[in-house]
């Protein structure tokens, strides 16, 4: 895999951080539609936007929408291909989204905010594809940094920061991943701030720092807020804590935690399911239950492979574990898939 150093160097990071801080409001008046995370929408004119969100004017009243609490904005004048691309991207169909984005003729677009949307979804889709092994991480990171530099007033600002952290972590650049994830603590939405802590916990897991990871996850588990977003982050944090406990050799405690998680598992939430079964695999390994660990990682591999980082981790563990039960040929198969889908993992 291409080295991340040219993209995630200290100099580039400082430039990017400076861009982060300089994001400023921008005013326009058009008929637009802002959708929240529940799918409800309000129509009006986006009269101001910044990295922290947008202000929508309707019948003389101004309503604030925070970045992190917006699912999408449909702008007056959106090309049909952008509308389709946005829908595909938010549904995880990144190839189809890029196909539609390539049909957009930028020279026919009058509003800068719409050009900004095109640029963001290009960068987002390329990043997500790179994370799934279908593109170069270095190129995807470069496009995201270019997006942030050219669109300092975008409500997608923190989304871009999270993706940059994901790309850095996928490249084993944990230090830069921590910096990007920590920057999300400056976001206006409570859930984004909490997600920042969860993501930092994932980095600690990558570094095999069990106590530090437990500390991050426990901060989330101790929260009283019960919004849908935060409850979901608490479930993810339980799975992360189970892995951290396993790293510390507390297999029984980790196993008990994953028992509860599996009993309450919703298989439609692929990310949660994949992380729970990987946590189960880690807890079984800590108990020297190799067959149990293999079964858990196979759940992720066979049922939840669309979650790329969890799938890659499951394959990596299967490469190590299959020979221990006398099946080196299965290890070779897992290694081949790991190298072809996630080169450099």
Regions found by a protein language model. Name each.
Residues 294-302, 315-345:
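TPR/TPR-like (Sel1-like) alpha-helical repeat modules
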Residues 2-15:
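Bacterial N-terminal signal peptides that target proteins for export
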Residues 28-171, 175, 179, 186, ...:
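Compositionally biased alpha-helical segments
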Residues 232-250, 256, 283:
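Alpha-helical scaffold segments of alpha-solenoid architecture
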Residues 98, 134, 138-141, 158, ...:
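Conserved positions within tetratricopeptide repeat
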Residues 14-24:
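Bacterial N-terminal signal peptides
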Residues 90, 128, 170, 206, ...:
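Register position in tetratricopeptide repeats
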């Amino acid at each position: 895999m291409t080295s991340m150093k040219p993209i995630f160097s200290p100099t580039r990071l400082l430039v990017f951080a400076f861009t982060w801080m300089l994001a400023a409001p921008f005013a326009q008046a058009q008929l637009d539609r802002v959708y929240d995370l529940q799918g409800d929408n309000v129509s009006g004119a986006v009269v101001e936007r910044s990295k922290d969100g947008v202000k929508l004017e309707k019948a003389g009243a101004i309503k604030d929408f925070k970045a992190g609490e917006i699912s999408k904005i449909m702008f007056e004048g959106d090309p049909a291909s952008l509308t389709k691309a946005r829908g595909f991207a938010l549904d995880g169909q990144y190839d189809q989204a890029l196909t539609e984005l390539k049909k957009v003729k930028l020279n026919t677009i009058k509003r800068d905010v719409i050009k900004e949307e095109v640029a963001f979804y290009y960068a987002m889709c390329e990043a997500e594809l790179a994370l799934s092994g279908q593109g170069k991480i270095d190129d995807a990171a470069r496009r995201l940094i270019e997006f942030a530099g050219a669109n300092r007033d975008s409500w997608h600002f923190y989304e871009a920061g999270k993706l940059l952290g994901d790309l850095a972590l996928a490249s084993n650049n944990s230090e830069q991943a921590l910096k990007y994830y920590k920057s999300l603590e400056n976001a206006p939405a409570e859930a984004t701030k909490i997600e920042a802590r969860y993501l930092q916990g994932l980095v600690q897991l990558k570094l095999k720092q069990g106590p530090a990871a437990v500390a991050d996850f426990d901060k989330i588990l101790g929260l009283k807020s019960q919004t849908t977003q935060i409850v979901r982050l608490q479930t993810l944090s339980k799975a992360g804590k189970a892995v951290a406990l396993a790293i510390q050799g507390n297999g029984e405690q980790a196993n008990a935690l994953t028992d509860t998680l599996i009993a309450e598992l919703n298989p439609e939430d692929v990310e949660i399911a994949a992380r729970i079964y990987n946590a189960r695999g880690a807890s079984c390994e800590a108990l020297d239950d190799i067959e149990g660990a293999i079964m858990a990682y196979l759940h992720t591999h066979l049922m939840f492979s669309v979650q790329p980082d969890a799938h890659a981790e499951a394959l990596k563990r299967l490469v190590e574990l299959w020979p221990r039960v006398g099946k080196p040929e299965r290890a070779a198969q897992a290694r081949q898939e790991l190298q072809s889908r996630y080169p450099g993992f």
